[in-house]
A protein has these predicted regions:
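Compositionally biased, intrinsically disordered low-complexity segments
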Residues: 1-2, 135
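Non-catalytic connector elements of ABC transporters
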Residues: 37, 48-174
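Internal alpha/beta loop-helix hairpins
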Residues: 3-55
Length: 174
């Protein structure tokens, strides 16, 4: 078994297999470092029940204090788009980018932007529902990195900046 470590400023943040680090990041820094994530403030009501946006969701995590504030990590590929009436949450599509094998869809949920990666197209302006299975929620204790990476509100105007590339002139022109 091959173990890896994720470090920040000379300090080990997490040691584990690549799969363990990806699927169960220990803090917001690790979650952001290893890939795109939606990181949302939540409350762990009890073992296997997390709250966000005033709603309760089943999850697989436990070992937290009742009503403990937590960071909830939801990977973009773990979110399913469903009809509004079937959604655990509903939001509005604000951006759609075709990526070849999938779409990157930015959805506004009560002022917070989430990234969803899906093969299903939804047009800008559409009201959609989303469904997240219990194993799609990854619950982390709050840490000094909490809030540094957004309520993946990094998927607002920052997303455009990431996709635009350098603003210099066309290098092919002479």
């Amino acid at each position: 078994v091959l173990f890896r470590s994720v470090m920040n400023e000379g300090r080990i943040q997490q040691i584990g297999t690549p799969q363990d680090i990806y699927n169960e990041p220990k803090n917001a820094f690790v979650a952001d470092f290893i890939g795109e994530s939606n990181i949302i403030d939540g409350i762990m009501h009890e073992d296997r029940v997390v709250g966000m946006y005033g709603k309760k969701f089943p999850c697989l995590d436990g070992g937290f204090q009742p009503n403990e504030p937590v960071d909830v990590v939801i990977r973009p590929e773990d979110i399913d788009i469903v009809p509004v009436e079937q959604g655990q949450l509903t939001g509005t599509v604000t951006e759609v980018t075709f990526k070849g094998m999938h779409y990157d869809i930015i959805v506004d949920f009560k002022g917070f932007k989430w990234l969803i990666q899906t093969t299903d197209f939804s047009p800008v302006g559409a009201r959609i529902g989303v469904k997240i299975d219990p194993d799609g929620f990854h619950i982390m204790k709050k840490s000094r990195y909490s809030g540094m990476f957004g309520d993946y509100s990094s998927y607002s105007s920052e997303y455009d900046e990431l996709n635009e590339g350098p603003e210099e002139g066309n290098e092919d022109e002479e």
